[in-house]
């Protein structure tokens, strides 16, 4: 898995340079598990979730039916190590990076054109012997479904099904448009087809 750390600046495509003047290696979405094209995101130091989400808008220009862009602000004293994803619909469309203490990680979960399904999945971060599981779900048909989000810290990777339905020890999911607060993680998912998922982890 590729990880790019950029402190005090943000990641861009290979044709540009980051603010501190260091060239960025070109990485395609195929390298990160997606389709063709450049899709580099990473970690911003000392930046909150709102500023981080704005940087995603400045960098990522994906043309997809459904997505949620996510900013995970790590306010704990631990490094959150990227530990994989669990897909229900769609996939990680960008690089999925570790998040040092005091930094904010940014990425995009997307569902490209094709089957009429939403953008839904779980991302996992490991720290010590614990795993932070973050779930978000954006529907395709808003007449039938709503957006939901959840979080859980446990000793294993939690399934989408359990987090979505609040099963096997998971708290009930939080409806989009509302703040959730579970296991030291505060989160907010907007109710939009192109949504924002804000996460503040204090541990």
Swiss-Prot record:
SUPFAM superfamilies tied to this protein: Cytolysin/lectin
Keywords per UniProt: Cytolysis, Hemolysis, Membrane, Nematocyst, Secreted, Signal, Target cell membrane, Target membrane, Toxin, Transmembrane
Tissue expr: Strongly expressed in the gland and mucous cells in the endoderm.
GO biological process: cytolysis in another organism; monoatomic cation transport; pore complex assembly
Signal peptide location: 1-21
Gene3D superfamilies assigned to the protein according to its UniProt record, in alphabetical order: Cytolysin/lectin
Gene Ontology CC annotations of this record: extracellular region; nematocyst; other organism cell membrane; pore complex
Subcellular location: Nematocyst; Secreted; Target cell membrane
GO molecular function, one term: toxin activity
InterPro entries xref list: Actinoporin_PFT, Anemon_actinoporin-like, Cytolysin/lectin
A Pfam entry, by short name: Anemone_cytotox
Superkingdom of the source species: Eukaryota
Motif (Cell attachment site): 175-177
Function: Pore-forming protein that forms hydrophilic pores and causes cytolysis. Compared to equinatoxin-2 (AC P61914), it reveals lower cytolysis activity (5-12-fold difference, tested on erythrocytes), a larger pore size (probably 2-3 nm) and different affinity to membrane lipids (100-fold lower affinity to sphingomyelin). Binds to sulfatides (SFT). Shows cytolytic activity on HeLa cells, with a different potency than its paralogs (from most potent to less potent: HALT-4>HALT-6~HALT-1>HALT-3>HALT-7>HALT-2).
Xref: PANTHER family: BRYOPORIN (PTHR40388:SF1)
Free-text comment on this protein's domains from its UniProt entry: Composed of a long N-terminal alpha-helix and a core region rich in beta-sheet structures. Before the pore formation, the alpha-helix binds the lipid membrane, partitions into the lipid-water interface and stabilizes the monomeric molecule on the membrane. Finally, it traverses the bilayer, thus forming the transmembrane pore.
Similarity comment: Belongs to the actinoporin family. HALT subfamily.
Subunit structure, as described in the record: Octamer or nonamer in membranes. Monomer in the soluble state. In vitro, interacts with folate receptor alpha (of target organism).
The protein's name: Hydra actinoporin-like toxin 2
């Amino acid at each position: 898995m590729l990880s790019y750390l950029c402190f005090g600046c943000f990641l861009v495509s290979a044709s540009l340079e980051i603010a501190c003047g260091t060239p960025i290696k070109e990485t395609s979405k195929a390298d990160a598990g997606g389709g063709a094209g450049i899709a580099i995101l990473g970690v911003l130091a000392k930046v909150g979730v709102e500023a981080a989400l704005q940087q995603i808008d400045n960098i990522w220009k994906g043309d997809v039916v459904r997505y949620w862009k996510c900013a995970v602000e790590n306010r704990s004293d631990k490094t959150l190590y990227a530990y994989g994803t669990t897909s229900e619909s769609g996939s990680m469309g960008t690089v999925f990076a570790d998040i040092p203490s005091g930094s904010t990680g940014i990425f995009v979960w997307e569902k490209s054109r094709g089957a009429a399904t939403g953008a839904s999945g779980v991302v996992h971060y490991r720290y010590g012997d614990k795993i932070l599981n973050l779930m978000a779900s954006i529907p395709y048909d808003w007449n039938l479904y709503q957006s939901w989000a959840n979080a859980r810290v446990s000793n294993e990777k939690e399934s989408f099904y359990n987090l979505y339905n609040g099963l096997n020890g998971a708290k009930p999911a939080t409806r989009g448009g509302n703040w959730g607060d579970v296991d030291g993680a505060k989160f907010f998912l907007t109710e939009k087809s192109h949504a924002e998922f804000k996460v503040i982890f204090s541990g």
